[in-house]
């Protein structure tokens, strides 16, 4: 028998980057399906636009850097970046917005730092924030869920609105955003923040059609539950660890509960925070990015808790209704500090 001498490491992880990225893409299917059901075909069109833009942008930069295009594109990271950005923006946003945001995310937020594994900030959230700051009106023009919508665009209408701004019958975004009460609709979080600032009581706000859902708002509660299902599957597949999602959701729920108990007339109830906006998408698909999140177990708990606190503060007191993207980027800034103070002690070394 011949024994081959090899250098360490002797224990190998069989899961390559492309495999993990593929698992995340598959886990996103329930969330995508829910958004398609409640908000129409625009979500699918945005995903296709973002995916093509991400692959082309990544290929262009790799070509300029004289690196292997095919080998890098196979890791599926560009596709995941495009997907996360596409599901975060309104389904009928103009086509050039998702292209601009995706190209910025891939080229500036990822490749400019050296590519996958080198970027300090989540690329998809960088692209989202750039779009939100630059085009706030378009980025907050969400359609009402089909449960309370008057006009539900079909596949052809969705394409026409995205590329031309109006449907074949001449309808525009203002028409499509009308709810059953004849008022243009926004997300539950946006509606709550705007109504509170206008002096409406929480009891009055909860009577709006957008809050006709069982838990947290028409459509959005099921979208978040779908992303939660995908996240649980990722945990079961061991593609992500439990520390960040758990600490994020527990902290957000705790802050929301305390705030609601102390100020029920101005702050949203915990179920609205947990099941509205991008809460579950952020908890399981964005914050768990292995490149931009903390790398130690204690650090992951701190990182997730910090993000949860920031989301609640931005939603409750900030100028933006959701806040997940800003919370993720602010938490990304603290990762080097968190990792420095939570790294495990080398065996045999004493403190001091």
From Swiss-Prot:
Provide the protein's localization. Cell inner membrane
Keywords (A to Z) from UniProt: Cell inner membrane, Cell membrane, Electron transport, Flavoprotein, FMN, Membrane, Phosphoprotein, Translocase, Transmembrane, Transmembrane helix, Transport
Q: Name one GO biological process term.
A: electron transport chain
Pfam annotation, one family: NQR2_RnfD_RnfE
**Which stretches are transmembrane?**
20-40, 42-62, 78-109, 123-143, 148-168, 214-234, 242-262, 267-287, 301-321, 322-342
Which residue stretches, if any, does this entry annotate as coiled coil?
none
UniProt GO cellular component terms? plasma membrane
Could you tell me which InterPro entries the record lists for this protein? NqrB/RnfD (IPR004338), RnfD_bac (IPR011303)
Q: What is its EC number?
A: 7.-.-.-
Q: Which cofactor does it need?
A: FMN
The way it spans or sits in the membrane comes to: Multi-pass membrane protein
Post-translational modification FMN phosphoryl threonine, affected residues:
187
What PANTHER family does its record include?
ELECTRON TRANSPORT COMPLEX PROTEIN RNFD, ION-TRANSLOCATING OXIDOREDUCTASE COMPLEX SUBUNIT D
Subunit composition and interactions: The complex is composed of six subunits: RsxA, RsxB, RsxC, RsxD, RsxE and RsxG.
What this protein is reported to do is described as: Part of a membrane-bound complex that couples electron transfer with translocation of ions across the membrane. Required to maintain the reduced state of SoxR.
Q: Which family does it belong to?
A: Belongs to the NqrB/RnfD family.
Check the record and name the HAMAP family matching this protein: RsxD_RnfD
What's the protein here called?
Ion-translocating oxidoreductase complex subunit D
